[in-house]
Design a protein with these regions (language model features):
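Short, glycine/charge-rich flexible loops or terminal/linker lids adjacent to PRPP-binding catalytic cores
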Residues: 308-353, 364, 391-397, 401
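Secondary-structure transition/capping motifs at alpha-helix termini
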Residues: 128, 149-150, 283-287, 305-312, ...
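A conserved beta-strand->alpha-helix junction
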Residues: 132, 137-141, 311-322, 419-437
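Phosphate/diphosphate-binding loops
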Residues: 159, 207-208, 215-216, 220-224, ...
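Conserved short alpha-helical segments that host acidic/polar catalytic motifs at enzyme active sites
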Residues: 1-222, 227-286, 292, 380, ...
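PRPP-dependent phosphoribosyltransferase catalytic core
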Residues: 161, 176, 213-219, 371-473
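Generic beta-strand/beta-sheet core signal
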Residues: 108, 173, 181-182, 193, ...
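Flexible loop/turn segments at secondary-structure boundaries
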Residues: 84-85, 115, 187-188, 209-210, ...
């Protein structure tokens, strides 16, 4: 606990006018776990684009009144955001809208470009004027430039994919089409389904399809472009080359909702397997197994089932406060832990506790949780982590941007155990990650430093905005 996801996207196209904004609203609600800084919806009503975007949760930004001001339409795209490039400002709220000579479009993007600065430099030299510090605007401008030289919006997206490096799962709405695209490595999830009235929907996770009553069809393949219009859907599978699929393994460990299925793998089942492996790797005599809500619960259940130690609900989560991993400020993170989790004393008092969590990044949150359990009377605490230690930055859309902030880069497992105040500490072995999804097709660069794409020197989350600020001085 202590990391955050980047974004969630949702799109819909229908053959006749309907309240598409309301459907996107429910879809974004189901994706709220993927981003809690801001959200937005853009509706296309016969070529007229109307949007509502702001900082805050879906429930805060979209009221009955604000939704009523969004028109009925045939297409809409929505987004929930945690900023992995660019700051937390209203300008960076998505979807990003762009006008061009051949029309207008709105783009929502999940992921992170590793060559965003290089692309932005070239665009600015050619006269582009940027209004945000988000790499999504860079994607939108590249598509716009390519659109002026191609016969269709899908051709423009195809050409753009040849220029982008890094992670992107995106949904684009133009005047007449909805486009969905997933990068050639498939770093971030993207799937689509269909509603009973024939509407097609696209979402970051299958749980969002279920939320709006859509039937899941399948995940987009790495490098695939789907084109939706009033006649239906056409797949343009390209840009795959010889690349091996590299879906982020942390989607399964932490980011995704447990009721989602990504690339035919149940997130819930993968977390159960992680807990079982931890029980095999690090057996211990204990009285109760407790998971840290929410993403540690399934792994805790797997550990309990495999070890035979009873499973207990020892931590209660306040559902009305955001994930600590999604709190950009360290002070906010500390304050939120104190009010977010509450120990169940009769489950913990006098017990030897196995505590299961999904990760340790800085150690800040973990220390607070251990203190909660100690104060509730835990006699022993044996911490088990359903991921390997974080040792490297992520450049593909996760907020792990500096080794200096990663506790495992500077301390051994035994030292970390002492710093956290636990009796023992064990991480999932990196060699076991493939067992979670029964495949070796995943990205684990934050654990092993093996980046599937070229990474520009000194690329950081804050470099994008810092460089832009330096230019203005």
């Amino acid at each position: 606990m202590g990391i955050h996801e980047e974004c969630g996207v949702f799109g819909i196209i229908n053959t006749r006018k309907k309240n598409v904004a309301e459907i996107v609203y429910y879809g974004l609600y189901a994706l709220q776990h993927r981003g809690q800084e801001s959200c937005g919806i853009v509706v296309n009503d016969e070529g007229v684009f109307t949007s509502h975007k702001d900082l805050g949760l879906v429930s805060e930004v979209f009221t009955k009144d604000s939704l009523s001001h969004l028109p009925e339409g045939t297409m809409a795209v929505g987004h929930v955001r945690y900023g992995t490039t660019g700051g937390t400002t209203r300008n960076n709220c998505q979807p990003i809208e762009v006008n061009h000579q051949k029309g207008k479009m709105a783009v929502a993007h999940n992921g992170n470009l590793s060559n965003a600065l290089e692309l932005r430099d070239k665009l600015e030299l050619s006269g582009a004027i940027f209004h945000t510090t988000s790499d999504t605007e860079t994607i939108a401008y590249v598509i716009t430039r390519e659109r002026l030289m191609t016969p269709s919006i899908e051709d423009a997206v195809s050409n753009t994919m040849n220029l982008l490096e890094g992670a992107y799962s995106l949904v684009l709405v133009s005047s007449a089409k909805m486009i969905a695209a997933r990068d050639p490595y498939g770093f971030r999830p993207l799937c689509y389904g269909q509603m009973s009235d024939g509407s097609y929907v696209v979402a970051s996770e299958s749980c969002a399809l279920s939320a709006v009553g859509a039937e899941f069809i399948r995940d987009l393949l790495p490098g695939e472009i789907l084109v939706f219009d009033q006649k239906g859907m056409v797949s343009r599978k390209e840009h795959c080359g010889e690349q091996k699929k590299k879906t982020c393994i942390f989607e399964y460990i932490y980011f995704a909702r447990p009721d989602s299925v990504i690339d035919n793998v149940s997130v819930h089942a993968s977390r159960i397997r992680a807990g079982q492996l931890l029980a095999e790797n690090y057996p211990v005599k204990a009285d109760v197994v407790i998971g840290v809500p929410d993403s540690g619960l399934d792994a805790a259940l797997g550990y309990a089932n495999k070890s035979g130690i009873p499973y207990g609900i020892g931590l209660i989560k306040n559902k009305y406060i955001g994930r600590t991993f999604i709190s950009p400020s360290q002070n906010e993170r500390l304050d939120k832990v104190r009010i977010k989790l509450s120990p169940v004393k009769n489950v913990i008092d006098g017990k030897r506790v196995v505590l299961i969590d999904d990760s340790i990044v800085r150690g800040t949150t973990s220390r607070q949780i251990v203190k909660l359990l100690r104060d509730a009377g835990a006699r022993e605490i044996h911490m088990r982590i359903s991921a390997p230690p974080f040792l490297h930055p992520c450049y593909y859309g996760t907020d792990i941007d500096s080794e200096e902030n990663l506790i495992a880069c500077h301390h051994s497992t035994e030292e970390i155990a002492g710093m956290l105040g636990v009796n023992s500490l064990g991480y999932l072995e990196i060699s076991q990650l493939g067992k979670l999804i029964e495949s070796e097709d995943y990205c684990a660069a934050c654990f092993n430093g093996r980046y599937p794409t070229r990474i520009p020197i000194d690329l950081r989350k804050d470099r994008f905005e810092r460089k832009l600020s330096e230019r203005k001085k």
